């Protein structure tokens, strides 16, 4: 049978809306009263942007003090055993380390944006360090 072209027709009158069945009505009202409520979720990226604003406003250190101190002591053991640190020296190292990392991530983000991406990748960090002259 050959296909025929269908044309739009204006409806005349039509049927009255049917009443809902009892089971359908019960199904629609059940989640509102006794069902388990789904936990609220923000859209992807909303929480990330909120965290960016929060951390850009603040000045506190982001790496926990004790894990950083253990890392410093572990690295220092390679050079000399039985080395002791003043607490102010560890704090100065942590301030400098975090400042370096923040700057590196800023440059890394610029490299990702230059590549028309929003996600940073290891190659962006490598490029940023190479441009800075830290690693050939």
UniProtKB/Swiss-Prot annotation:
Keywords: Acetylation, Chromosome, DNA-binding, Methylation, Nucleosome core, Nucleus, Phosphoprotein
Top-level taxon of the source organism: Eukaryota
Positions bearing Phosphoserine: 11
Molecular functions (GO terms): DNA binding; protein heterodimerization activity; structural constituent of chromatin
Predominant subcellular localization, coarse grouping: nucleus
Gene3D superfamilies assigned to the protein according to its UniProt record, in alphabetical order: Histone, subunit A
Post-translational changes noted in the entry: Acetylation is generally linked to gene activation.
Region (Disordered) residue spans: 1-43
Modified residues (N6-acetyllysine): 10, 15, 24
PANTHER family per record: HISTONE H3
Protein name in the entry: Histone H3, embryonic
Organism (species): Dermasterias imbricata (Leather sea star)
């Amino acid at each position: 049978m050959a296909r025929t072209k269908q044309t739009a027709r204006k409806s005349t009158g039509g049927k009255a809306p049917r009443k809902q069945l009892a089971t359908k009505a019960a199904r629609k009202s059940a989640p509102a009263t006794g069902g388990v409520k789904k936990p609220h979720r923000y859209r992807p990226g909303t929480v990330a942007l909120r965290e960016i604003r929060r951390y850009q406003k603040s000045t506190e250190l982001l790496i926990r003090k004790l894990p950083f101190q253990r890392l410093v002591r572990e690295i220092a053991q390679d050079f000399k055993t039985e080395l002791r640190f003043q607490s102010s020296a560890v704090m100065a190292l942590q301030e400098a380390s975090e400042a370096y990392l923040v700057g590196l991530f800023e440059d890394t983000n610029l490299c990702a944006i230059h590549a028309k991406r929003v996600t940073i990748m290891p190659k962006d960090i490598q490029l940023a360090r190479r441009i800075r002259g830290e690693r050939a």
